[in-house]
């Protein structure tokens, strides 16, 4: 870049010398050019820095000789300081070169007047600034800066710092060089016409400097700008602080929520016993290198005459259908309590702690209505006589193309069930599995429910391990079941956020769902009427009416339900309607 700039400065000074000679020629009284010796007046020395003597003319004084000053080397640090000073928005314009030199000079790196003047001329040629200095003024008068293009100066400052954009700057300088050459050619042509055939001469263009390789490392200026842009403003910090305070308020539990949680908290302590990780007492003592097993619950191996211990544990354990002949190892709970174990009596749950106690004097939530049930075929029962319910739960016998120990319902029979009459506002819990998951969603929409949640039951075996050899599943063994949760209308008075949507429980008999689901539903809607469809004897629960064809007769206690049932079925027999 410096070689190109030097060439431009040399051309500009040659132009100034030629223009000065033309001005002096015009001021002569004769106003005519000496054609006998035109080279003495018009031929500038483009190739030499030494002054060229001119021959005397007959009608005027000798023109003064002009020499081209040697080009100063450009100081990168001085150029950077000058760019930074000129790009300052607080700089008052116009200002002269002397004031600029004093402003950017430091004791460690003083700036010279010639260097500042040269850089100002360079910036003016690059159209970064505008300077005011007449062609005929003396060199003693400093250059006056009248205008500064701050956007271009900022861009140039970044280019100098990063040493990027070298090609763009070189292109701009090359354009200035071409314009200077065009001006020089025009003046030379005019002088040749006045000299009646004077041979025109032009300087050879300077060679283009080779392009330097661009460096991709980020400069300190870019890093500082990026850090400033990444910093949050005061307004953003205040807004973030307010948002955090609002979030903390929203996440804080209210007094009502705390009261509800306390209402359903286990009294005294949880009435459960934890299983030992090592299974049997022998493995527990071996692992802990102790004389006695831990106080957790253990298992005992069942070793029969036909048992082959080398085969390992049975995959189905206590759910095995052929335990009388199965050769694999089975287990049972080792309920024997070591009375000599220290602290064993302290950890035995007392009967007093297991009693239900009311909280806050309000016993309405703790009041449970005795269980009720009706043995019937749900397809033919007029369920409208049972009234309205807050929660409906169903475990339908889906036709999943598998041999089951009970009868199944077809898809059309499931769709025709009169479920909508049981509720105006409330929740429906629908157990689905396999291909029935899509059919269950279809039935929810058909019955007027919107699916809002889905409970997952992760099945564990007797040893509290994940099931890997389930009896269901075609491509993969199923180790879980799904319970779709649908909502109808606008239910009020339900508790939100008390339980999660995952149940981890042991597998029992076929289609025997975990008892934890009843606790979840009771905490969701305490003290309300609930009904379960397709239930069995183990499903009867307080506050629930259970319907199914495997129950023991009819057991109704609600006076209103009893009256409507006797009116609809006087003989107590629920038979298939004649129109079906």
Curated annotation (Swiss-Prot):
Positions carrying N-acetylserine: 2
Post-translational events: Sumoylation inhibits the N6-adenosine-methyltransferase activity. Sumoylation does not affect subcellular location or interaction with METTL14. Desumoylated by SENP1.
One GO term describing the cellular component: nucleus
Expression sites by tissue: Present in both germ cells and somatic cells during testis development (at protein level).
Biased composition (Low complexity): 55-67
Start and end residues of each stretch annotated as Interphase loop: 462-479
Activity regulation information from UniProt: Methyltransferase activity is regulated by miRNAs via a sequence pairing mechanism. Methyltransferase activity is inhibited by sumoylation.
Residues bearing PTM Phosphoserine: 2, 43, 48, 50, 219, 243, 350
Short motif (Nuclear localization signal): ranges: 210-215
Compartment(s) of residence: Nucleus; Nucleus speckle; Cytoplasm
Disruption phenotype: Embryonic lethality. Blastocysts retain normal morphology and expression of pluripotency markers and yield embryonic stem cells (ESCs) at the expected ratio. However, they fail to adequately terminate their naive state and undergo aberrant and restricted lineage priming at the postimplantation stage, leading to early embryonic lethality. mRNAs show a nearly complete absence of N6-methyladenosine (m6A) methylation. RNAs show defects in splicing and adenosine to inosine editing.
UniProt signal peptide: none
Binding site for S-adenosyl-L-methionine: 377-378, 395, 513, 536-539, 549-550
Region (Interaction with METTL14) residue spans: 450-454, 464-480
Keyword Methyltransferase (UniProt): yes
Major location category of this protein: nucleus
Family to which this protein belongs: Belongs to the MT-A70-like family.
UniProt xrefs under PANTHER family: N6-ADENOSINE-METHYLTRANSFERASE (PTHR12829), N6-ADENOSINE-METHYLTRANSFERASE CATALYTIC SUBUNIT (PTHR12829:SF7)
Subunit structure: Heterodimer; heterodimerizes with METTL14 to form an antiparallel heterodimer that constitutes an active methyltransferase. Component of the WMM complex, a N6-methyltransferase complex composed of a catalytic subcomplex, named MAC, and of an associated subcomplex, named MACOM. The MAC subcomplex is composed of METTL3 and METTL14. The MACOM subcomplex is composed of WTAP, ZC3H13, CBLL1/HAKAI, VIRMA, and, in some cases of RBM15 (RBM15 or RBM15B). Interacts with NCBP1/CBP80. Interacts with EIF4E. Interacts with EIF3B.
Its biological purpose: The METTL3-METTL14 heterodimer forms a N6-methyltransferase complex that methylates adenosine residues at the N(6) position of some RNAs and regulates various processes such as the circadian clock, differentiation of embryonic and hematopoietic stem cells, cortical neurogenesis, response to DNA damage, differentiation of T-cells and primary miRNA processing. In the heterodimer formed with METTL14, METTL3 constitutes the catalytic core.
Designated name of the protein: N(6)-adenosine-methyltransferase catalytic subunit METTL3
Organism: Mus musculus (Mouse)
Gene of this entry: Mettl3
